[in-house]
Swiss-Prot record:
Job description of the protein: With S4 and S5 plays an important role in translational accuracy. Interacts with and stabilizes bases of the 16S rRNA that are involved in tRNA selection in the A site and with the mRNA backbone. Located at the interface of the 30S and 50S subunits, it traverses the body of the 30S subunit contacting proteins on the other side and probably holding the rRNA structure together. The combined cluster of proteins S8, S12 and S17 appears to hold together the shoulder and platform of the 30S subunit.
Assembly notes: Part of the 30S ribosomal subunit. Contacts proteins S8 and S17. May interact with IF1 in the 30S initiation complex.
Protein name (record): Small ribosomal subunit protein uS12
Family: Belongs to the universal ribosomal protein uS12 family.
InterPro entries in UniProt: NA-bd_OB-fold, Ribosomal_uS12, Ribosomal_uS12_bac
Species assigned in the record: Nautilia profundicola (strain ATCC BAA-1463 / DSM 18972 / AmH)
A Pfam cross-reference name: Ribosom_S12_S23
Gene coding for it: rpsL
Amino acid sequence: MPTINQLVRKGRKQVIKKSKSPALVSCPQRRGVCTRVYTTTPKKPNSALRKVAKVRLTSGYEVISYIPGEGHNLQEHSIVLVRGGRVKDLPGVKYHIVRGALDTAGVKGRVHSRSKYGTKKADAGKK
């Protein structure tokens, strides 16, 4: 516990909050170009082929970002929108690609949570 005199001389040191998504540089999303689209396997208890893309952002960073949902249309040189948000079982993946924005198509046949996957409402009139 510091004395009053020590606090007057030095003061309290501010705790600096470290960003969880530094490549976005204080922006909610960033545009980028896919440099590589591939699949990778998750950490130990899980097993799958997770779809990821290496993206060069307009901020100059090159990051690995996750492609959510079933099926995608991304290739090399696709323009994508990247948001923050890590994938717990993929080490080094701290970003998500926004579905339904720029070159990324929404998920086909999605009925629930459509806004998260960029899917338009299915026409209820057709039966």
